[in-house]
């Protein structure tokens, strides 16, 4: 069953700038799908439409077989975790309070929130002692781990991730990529991950969708795209033969 479905969706920001053109895309339960493309290709817009942050001009979006316009927007967003590059942790709250924020506004018992925060901080590879700290006391990589933990707090079925590791150093970035792959394997959440980094897209995704100017150019598994690029645009986007051979050795 498609957990998320786009049916002939169009979106523009003004009359002469169409950012999503006739989008038809189904995302199955438990998939880790990476959306890749150049800046301005429409990737982040897709996440915002899934989360109800942006209305569509025409077409339909379904979440769990229910058209998005029929959802209570608060209930929808509580069932979707969102992780962004800027993280957005509340600086005046402890890490425990940040992780438990969504549960707190749902009036979950305090003890349940505390136990959930402990479970999640361990799940993302951090010790319980970090729960007492504040965001300013953490490194960039640690704050991103907390951001992932917070996104998982309400046990959502869907996790949206928008260039979440773009602001950290390369070593930390690779470590976070490894962590999110393990989390997906362990929790089987549906993850929609936006990136402009080709290697990251192939490392993480069970399916890759390549966008250009608001349209899907090619979608498929790592093997399908690497072995059978649809056209010259895809070939050029993937890079030179040396890099493509590297991707094949790493991911096929």
Indicate residue ranges for each PLM-predicted region.
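Conserved ABC ATPase "signature" C-loop
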Residues: 213-214
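Conserved catalytic motifs of ABC-family nucleotide-binding domains
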Residues: 155
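Conserved ABC ATPase "signature" region
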Residues: 104, 111-129
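ABC ATPase "signature
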Residues: 219-220, 228
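Helix-to-loop junction immediately C-terminal to a conserved catalytic motif
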Residues: 51
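Conserved ABC ATPase signature
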Residues: 134-138, 142
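The feature captures the beta-strand-to-loop junction immediately N-terminal to the Walker
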Residues: 36-38
